[in-house]
Amino acid sequence: MSGNGFGHLFRFTTFGESHGPAIGCVVDGVPARIPLTEADIQHYLDQRKPGQNRFTTQRREPDEVKILSGVFEGLTTGTSIGLLIENTDQRSKDYGEIKDTYRPGHADWVYQQKYGIRDYRGGGRSSARETAMRVAAGAIARKVLDALAPGLSIRGAMVQMGPHAIDRSRWDWAELGNNPFWCPDGAAAKSWEEYLDTIRKSGSSIGGVVEVVASGVPVGLGAPVYDKLDADLAKAMMSINAVKGVEIGDGFAAAALSGEENADEMRMGNDGQVGFLSNHAGGILGGISTGQDVVVRLAVKPTSSILTPKQSVDAKGNNVEVSTKGRHDPCVAIRAVPVAEAMMACTLADHLLRSLAQPRLS
């Protein structure tokens, strides 16, 4: 199985399965002498880890990361950074009844068809458990960005749960820590609690929309034609489990705009720098960053692991009904927020290093 790595100069490769002994990753391309500790990585892992409230899976994994290589006396050495997280709360028996049955909406059947073998315990390699290592890699990417692009910040939020979207006029980043949804609209978050409680108690699930904003991005990241920044961001976000759609800036809404409405007009500022009067493009033009906020939204489907019986087939070709047991998120979009932030960080770090490797000559 190929396709376990992401990036070019800043590159990470993940390994491990949901119910295996551990998950891990190897991060390459990190410059030497960048301060890095396990606590730096743990800070972001704690934002993603399961079992923190009733709205996420009750699988309780501490997600304690160990740095195995590439760091000496608190500084990166420039060599590969090896990271490991041990799995401690697997319940493989929850999946015994479906080991020969394909769960609708999951990767079970296609894995079996492609490889002739699959780890049925929690989805194996296709499990969102893998995303913990993306968050770990993203924490390192943030340290690279801190060193090479001071002032660059990345923040993510959940802006829609099912059909219920936030009121953008009430957007307040300070609200993110006041609710379990990473929601910037406090009033919306309160209504979501009751809504998701109903979904959760019924054994069902619901999707959502996540928005990630990177501020302070330098001008000039990305390159035509096939190395566009937005193309790589789309790939990064689409690679996250359960993501079924990605848009940059106004995205699909731009299709309904006129040319006059959509174009981000430009003016010279009092500081002598070029400024924009709007940001419909989401901070990227021609695949190259403009210096404005880079804005990405992703649509996250509802998890297919629900109690409601669904029609499927088994390995012997019989028609069956499947009701998925185990511990699952009623809305996976919640924990997708720190994962999306991490993929934004990894993509920007990679493009920043690539840009520095090909400087413009005076």
Curated annotation (Swiss-Prot):
Q: Which GO terms describe its molecular function?
A: chorismate synthase activity; FMN binding
Q: Write out the GO biological process terms.
A: amino acid biosynthetic process; aromatic amino acid family biosynthetic process; chorismate biosynthetic process
SUPFAM superfamilies, alphabetized = Chorismate synthase, AroC
Q: How is the cofactor bound?
A: Reduced FMN (FMNH(2)).
Catalysis: reaction(s): 5-O-(1-carboxyvinyl)-3-phosphoshikimate = chorismate + phosphate
> What pathway, per the record?
Metabolic intermediate biosynthesis; chorismate biosynthesis; chorismate from D-erythrose 4-phosphate and phosphoenolpyruvate: step 7/7
Q: Which GO terms describe its cellular component?
A: cytosol
Tell me which residues bind NADP(+): 48, 54
In terms of InterPro entries, this protein maps to:
Chorismate_synth, Chorismate_synth_AroC_sf, Chorismate_synthase_CS
Sorted alphabetically, the keyword list is:
Amino-acid biosynthesis, Aromatic amino acid biosynthesis, FAD, Flavoprotein, FMN, Lyase, NADP
EC number annotated for this UniProt entry: 4.2.3.5
Cofactors, names only = FMNH2
Q: Where does FMN bind?
A: 125-127, 241-242, 286, 301-305, 327
Which NCBIfam families does the record associate with it? aroC, PRK05382.1
Name the family the entry cites.
Belongs to the chorismate synthase family.
Indicate the quaternary assembly.
Homotetramer.
Q: What does this protein do?
A: This reaction introduces a second double bond into the aromatic ring system.
What is the name listed in the Swiss-Prot or TrEMBL entry for this protein? Answer: Chorismate synthase
Q: List the source organism.
A: Paramagnetospirillum magneticum (strain ATCC 700264 / AMB-1)
